[in-house]
Amino acid sequence: MSPRAVLVGLPGSGKTTIGKRLANALNLQLVDTDHMLEKKLGKTCNQIMGELGEPAFREQEAIVVAEALQTDGIVSLGGGAVVTESTRELLADHTVVYLNVSIDEGVRRTSGSNTRPLLNVADPRGKYAQLFAQRSAFYEEVSNFMVRCDGKEPRRVVTDILSFIEEVRLERLTERDASHQIRPQ
């Protein structure tokens, strides 16, 4: 088993919203690693981060990500999951979609949220810009496809991703067919 697509991006990029719609469109399950981690440890991500600190949180998160990547469906990773090298390595064989939002749009979408532990600071815009600078290269490294989400309706983002998934499926079929052709001697 392997997920049809893995969604990555900063907090507020739409991983959960788009993930639910994409899973519904494909008649698949959404596997959200933040929710898996919360269920496993019996606490919110905010509580886990506060109690364990970020390094220990990331270790626990990497374990959950490895489990999620063994499922069928659509997988939504926590925004910081890609900072862990082992997670990036695991993503190498998967269809990974980077949901890209600008700093301004990300701040707008996450403002007032109590569920985003790294953004509960005095200067959320500055912190968001810092996360963008730290993580953007990782998102680009692991992704096969990037969707710019600023100003796009969720249905349009889902349509873009569905088109990409279909392209990947057709490429794999073509490669498989080519490898099974009888070659003249």
Curated annotation (Swiss-Prot):
It is an enzyme of class 2 (transferase). ATP binds at residues 12-17, 116. It is found in: Cytoplasm. CDD domains: SK. Its EC number is 2.7.1.71. Mg(2+) binds at residue 16. It comes from the Bacteria. Substrate binds at residues 34, 58, 79, 135. Binds 1 Mg(2+) ion per subunit. One of its GO terms (molecular function) is ATP binding. Keywords: Amino-acid biosynthesis, Aromatic amino acid biosynthesis, ATP-binding, Cytoplasm, Kinase, Magnesium, Metal-binding, Nucleotide-binding, Transferase. Pathway: Metabolic intermediate biosynthesis; chorismate biosynthesis; chorismate from D-erythrose 4-phosphate and phosphoenolpyruvate: step 5/7. Catalyzes the specific phosphorylation of the 3-hydroxyl group of shikimic acid using ATP as a cosubstrate. Monomer. This is Shikimate kinase. It comes from Corynebacterium jeikeium (strain K411). The gene is aroK.
